[in-house]
Amino acid sequence: MNGVCNCNVTLVIAAFGVLAYLLGAIPNGFLIAKAKGIDIRKVGSGNIGATNVYRSVSKALGILTFALDSLKGAIPALWFPVQAAHCAQTSLPAWLPLLFGGLAIAGHTWPVYLKFKGGKGVATSAGALIGIAPAATGIGVLCWFVTLVTIRYMSVASIVAAVAVPAAGWWLYRANGLALPLALTALGALIIWRHKGNIQRLMNGSESRFEFKKKKP
């Protein structure tokens, strides 16, 4: 009987893991821009994320993209573990939010719907982490905002946040084990790596600054 129960738990976790990836893989920026007749992959930076939608389509749709991409991380990390436990009719491992949130981020970064060419994972990561590591995420958001307002480079602000969140994680959570700090470190490294093109543009002086108000033609 215990073997059957373990099998059911494994199947439930696997099923919700697949759903987390598929939800994360929904290319909100691509779909929103497509509805306006724009292929977001062929304008601006070519990225499907919120910043490129903000710059290349409209401010409002860029903000909408950010909100939807954040939800792609929050729903698997916060809601899926509860539903998985309900389906399995037993308590499940405490690391499930990390697993489901990580799979959603992987889906956004490597979406099956767009031949595995996705975004940089900043908004989806923020959504996933707000419930998993709220204090560290809050520190990261503060660092991101101050950097963005100060120097107006979205890429630099995202990289600063990608460093700040793991650093805060080691400070705040290491007493409870290394799993969460290590996961935050891996996620931060992924986000920085996904910004390698931005880093090259920063080095050669061609990176665009973020404009809070779109310039009038």
Language-model region placement:
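Loop-to-transmembrane alpha-helix initiation sites
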Residues: 138, 154-162, 176-187
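Mid-bilayer segments of alpha-helical transmembrane spans in multi-pass integral membrane proteins
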Residues: 108-113, 133
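Alpha-helical transmembrane segments in multi-pass membrane proteins
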Residues: 16, 20-25, 29, 33, ...
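Membrane-helix interface "capping/anchor" motifs
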Residues: 53, 111-117, 146-160
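Helix-coil boundary and interhelical linker segments in multi-pass alpha-helical membrane proteins
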Residues: 1-15, 77-99, 130-137, 171-183
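Interfacial segments of multi-pass membrane proteins
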Residues: 54-59, 80-84, 121-151, 163-173
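Oxyanion-binding and handling regions
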Residues: 171-217
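Cytosolic, membrane-interface loops and tails of multi-pass inner-membrane proteins
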Residues: 30-61, 200-217
